[in-house]
Amino acid sequence: MNYELLTTENAPVKMWTKGVPVEADARQQLINTAKMPFIFKHIAVMPDVHLGKGSTIGSVIPTKGAIIPAAVGVDIGCGMNALRTALTAADLPENLAELRQAIETAVPHGRTTGRCKRDKGAWENPPVNVDAKWAELEAGYQWLTQKYPRFLNTNNYKHLGTLGTGNHFIEICLDESDQVWIMLHSGSRGIGNAIGTYFIDLAQKEMQETLETLPSRDLAYFMEGTEYFDDYLKAVAWAQLFASLNRDAMMENVVTALQSVMQKTVKQPQTLAMEEINCHHNYVQKELHFGEEIYVTRKGAVSARAGQYGIIPGSMGAKSFIVRGLGNEESFCSCSHGAGRVMSRTKAKKLFSVEDQIRATAHVECRKDAEVIDEIPMAYKDIDAVMAAQSDLVEVIYTLRQVVCVKG
């Protein structure tokens, strides 16, 4: 048995956390969630677990007959995309700053501060590939905004194919054989945040009379068979599609940027299914487990069915992994979505300096300023320990090291 069993007054919690730290607040948050009467069998916890807003990051929450919107959160469909290119390290330019600049030009990122009307994190004039992907989203958007007009006043179309901020990133990486990979991390951007926030608030309002009886107000839920349950599932499915297409559009534009800098073909003919991977790690969907159809919420966790490829990034100074799932049913066929934080962003900014950031990322062409100190590698768990703790969930196919990193 490779997991720790945490017993509660209701469902148990199975934690793949051997050799990695788990803060007491995260344990209590997991216990609170496990108290809910509709938890199916047990909660599974990944080794990158840490305290989260709404629910615990690195948790897999299986439910029957209900869904907790705050467990999915506001970064709906957040996930990873990775592409193995036809390039090798020898093809990369000596000046990697030029490459980083080309990517930053190709993909809007960051957020506007102050009184500037221009949103630097959005497109002014979206390119053709964004238009094509928006066409796949338009029917769902029409339903969403007709039923909930509040979503008309959101960043949607102009956020498609954009990176965002925080821990979202685009990286150029090398594997063990010096093959070049493109890897990126983003979600459903402004519209997903708006959908998540609205339905979390709505669930709490709907349960206003009984809210105080819950272990936490963040555990407010929609019951299956109600209108809001159905609407939430439909809205979340749309946001998850937005997130997937968002990553696809960014990947296409990064490939184009690399080709313009290097004057070489970047994308090789696809011969293996795993050569391009696009996976969510913040989402909910219906799945079959232990012979029953249930709703699985992965909050900072990746699907790892037998033979399924996934992406587990480290921090901006640590290695990352392309993995293949082992289909461990006890984890609801899941694995970690990264290394996991060992401290809050606020604490990291107080504890570390720009000089620390420069030293920790000396081998990476990336931002090294005060605004990204909260993403310093030391703010995250040891990725090797995280991988060791989930050796029965996934097998490593490629180990990547980054050479260029773009942050919002």
Curated annotation (Swiss-Prot):
Alphabetical list of InterPro entries matching this protein: RtcB, RtcB-like, RtcB-like_sf
Binding site for GMP: 167-171, 281-282, 313-316, 320, 337-340, 407
Gene3D superfamilies (UniProt xref): tRNA-splicing ligase RtcB
Co-factor remark: Binds 2 manganese ions per subunit.
Record's keyword annotation contains Transport: no
Binding site for Mn(2+) 2: C78, H185, H281
Keywords, sorted A to Z: GTP-binding, Ligase, Manganese, Metal-binding, Nucleotide-binding, RNA repair
A single GO BP: RNA repair
Catalysis: reaction(s): a 3'-end 3'-phospho-ribonucleotide-RNA + a 5'-end dephospho-ribonucleoside-RNA + GTP = a ribonucleotidyl-ribonucleotide-RNA + GMP + diphosphate; a 3'-end 2',3'-cyclophospho-ribonucleotide-RNA + a 5'-end dephospho-ribonucleoside-RNA + GTP + H2O = a ribonucleotidyl-ribonucleotide-RNA + GMP + diphosphate + H(+)
MF (Gene Ontology): DNA ligase activity; GTP binding; manganese ion binding
Cofactor(s) listed: Mn(2+)
Protein's job: GTP-dependent RNA ligase that is involved in RNA repair. Joins RNA with 2',3'-cyclic-phosphate or 3'-phosphate ends to RNA with 5'-hydroxy ends. GTP-dependent RNA ligase that is involved in tRNA repair. Repairs broken tRNA(Asp) and tRNA(Arg) that have been cleaved by colicin E5 or colicin D, respectively. Does not repair damaged 16S rRNA in 30S ribosomal subunits.
Record's subunit section: Monomer.
Protein family (similarity comment): Belongs to the RtcB family.
Protein name: RNA-splicing ligase RtcB1
